[in-house]
Structures are given as structure tokens and as C-alpha cells.
Regions:
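Active-site glycine-rich loops that stabilize anionic/oxyanionic intermediates
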Residues: 48-51, 121, 243-244
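Serine-hydrolase catalytic-loop signature spanning alpha/beta hydrolases and amidase-signature enzymes
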Residues: 50-58, 70
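Conserved alpha/beta-hydrolase
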Residues: 63-87
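Gly/Ala-rich beta-loop-alpha elbow adjacent to hydrolase catalytic centers
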Residues: 118-123, 127
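Flexible "cap/lid" loop of the alpha/beta hydrolase fold
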Residues: 136-171, 212-219
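Short beta-strand/loop motif that positions the catalytic acidic residue
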Residues: 233, 239-241, 245
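Conserved alpha/beta-hydrolase "acid-adjacent" motif
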Residues: 246-255
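Catalytic active-site module of serine/aspartate enzymes centered on a nucleophile-bearing elbow/loop
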Residues: 263-300
Length: 300
């Protein structure tokens, strides 16, 4: 439960980035003030593409009941509801990995205690970026998107991303998934009935930019999709992977883990049997939440 402290290396990273460039919303300000007022250990949840912060609502309840205070900030300009998101898809366009990372960075630095952070998919990449800046007391990256230095590109991951990557113009667009695309990329490990319910309840359009950034990260030394895996202030990290995940398969999680093992802090990986990319929101979400909670509890 330490205050946020930033060593010289971390400070240089922050100085060179456009930290907090996005406006923090009134709702996010309320979350920050509430967390600080409780005096409890904060946990910050970071969603990925095609989901909203509300995808963490049940997780927040679990962690609050365990004695933490929680925040689930938006990506910049996220609508509050799925219906609003579907009605105004253009607000998602052109959101990059760097912009979103800096937005969460600005939120975290306003907390009086260094938080634990948990992210899913591109949120799993973002929490590793934030931990690499020394801003996390303990981190869980669930089915994380790849970063520079992570080389595997399984065919299922390419197929999942192809609705975006198949057209270069999508780099600057907001892209929705059809039900069939969502079924393959997110909901392949659940029943047809549950898959359709998940699609209706959670799926929203997403920025195409992060997928292009991740896909080209190993070709671009200046990419925003990079992680400082050696910062001694990174803190403990758990990477989890759903066994049946088509979007971020085990090969990507394992390669991310191997890169993160360069760090001196605790680094662990867990494969969760029979789970797909929707593992944080489907009927088995509680299993993943409990694995994450058990890891966080060991350190804060």
C-alpha cells in the first residue's frame, strides 16, 4: 500500500511521453476522489477493444467485497452505455495505444496510493505499459495483446484481427464486429445462446489503430506498442491466457511472459482451461476474477 514513487528512469519515460493528454472526465474524477477518500488499496481495471468499462462491473463488486477500492476508467471518449456506443461509433476512431496509456497514466498519478492494475486484451497490453512506467503495485494481464519483441502471430489471431487489418483505411476508423466475427474472436468457448447474449450485452465498435500498431510493432522501433520490461519498479506481474483463446492465443501470452522474465520482479503465467477471449465477461468470469484477486492479495 505504498504511495506512487517514480525513480529517475521512470521519470525520464514520463517526461518523454504526452502523459495525461486526454481530458479526465467528471465520472473519472469522481472515481479518483472516491478511491482516495476511502484510504483503501485501489485496483484499476483497463478494458480492451470492443468492450466498455461496464464489462468490469461484476469484477469491481468482487474486489470491493475483498476490501479494495476500485476504478474502471474509460478510454478517451468512451460512451457510457453499449446503446450509446452503437449509436455513435465514430467516437472510438483514431484512439492509439499511446493516447490510451497516457490517459490511464494521468488517472493513476492522481491516486494517493499506487494501485494494482488489471487489464484484458489490449487492456492487458496497456497495464504492462503502465507497469513498465513504475505505476503499478501488482499487475494482471489477461489474454494480452502483443507488444514489440513478442514474435508469434498464430493464424487464429490473424483471423480474429482481419476484420480490421484487412483494410488499411481501418487504421483511422471505428470498426464494429459482426456476430460471426465476435463468435470466433471472443465467444468461441461458450454456447451459441450465451455467445449471442454476450454480443448483445457487451460488444461495441472499437478503434482500428491499436491493431495496426500491434501488428507492425516489430517493424517500428518507435512504436507505441512497446513495454519497458526491465524497469526495476515494474512490480509483480501475472499473465493469464485462456486455453481456447483465438484472439490472443497461448503462444502470444507465453512469448510476452518470456520477455517479461527479463525483469527482476515476480513474473508468473497461468493458462486457464477451456476458456476463450470472452473469459472476463462470460459465465465463467468469476474463476478469472478469483485467480486475479489471489495474485493481487499476495502483494497488496
Amino acid at each position: 500500500m505504498e504511495n506512487v514513487t517514480i525513480n529517475q528512469k521512470t521519470a525520464s519515460i514520463l517526461e518523454s511521453s504526452s502523459v495525461g493528454s486526454a481530458t479526465i472526465s467528471d465520472h473519472e474524477t469522481h472515481q479518483i476522489e472516491r478511491a482516495n477518500a476511502t484510504g483503501l488499496q485501489p485496483v484499476v481495471f483497463v478494458h480492451g477493444l470492443w468492450l466498455l468499462p461496464s464489462s468490469w462491473d461484476r469484477w469491481a463488486t468482487v474486489f470491493e467485497e475483498a476490501g479494495y477500492t476500485t476504478l474502471a476508467p474509460s478510454w478517451p471518449d468512451d460512451p457510457e452505455t453499449v446503446d450509446e456506443a452503437k449509436a455513435n461509433p465514430e467516437v472510438f476512431a483514431n484512439k492509439t495505444v499511446g493516447q490510451v496509456a497516457d490517459h490511464f497514466d494521468g488517472i493513476i498519478r492522481r491516486l494517493t496510493k499506487k494501485p494494482a492494475i488489471i487489464g484484458h486484451s489490449f487492456g492487458g497490453l496497456l497495464v504492462q505499459i503502465l507497469a513498465g512506467r513504475g505505476l503499478s503495485a501488482a499487475t494482471v494481464a489477461i489474454d494480452p495483446a502483443p507488444f514489440r519483441g513478442v514474435l508469434p502471430l498464430p493464424l487464429s489471431a490473424l483471423k480474429s484481427a482481419w476484420p480490421v487489418l484487412g483494410n488499411p483505411a481501418n487504421r483511422h476508423r471505428a470498426i464494429p464486429l459482426t456476430y460471426e466475427q465476435f463468435r470466433f474472436g471472443f465467444a468461441n468457448a461458450v454456447s451459441e445462446e450465451e455467445a449471442r447474449d454476450l454480443y448483445k450485452t457487451f460488444a461495441v465498435p472499437a478503434s482500428g489503430a491499436p491493431l495496426f500498431q500491434a501488428a507492425t510493432a516489430n517493424l517500428n522501433p518507435w512504436t507505441e506498442a512497446k513495454v519497458d520490461v526491465e524497469n526495476p519498479d515494474r512490480g509483480p506481474l501475472l499473465i493469464t491466457s485462456g486455453e481456447k483463446d483465438n484472439t490472443a492465443p497461448w503462444a502470444i501470452a507465453k512469448a510476452s511472459f518470456k520477455r517479461q522474465q527479463l525483469n527482476s520482479s515476480v513474473t508468473e503465467i497461468v493458462e486457464i482451461p477451456n476458456r476463450g477471449h470472452a473469459l472476463t465477461v462470460d459465465s465463467g468470469w468469476g474463476e478469472v476474477a478469483n485467480i486475479s484477486l489471489a495474485f493481487i492479495r499476495r502483494f497488496v
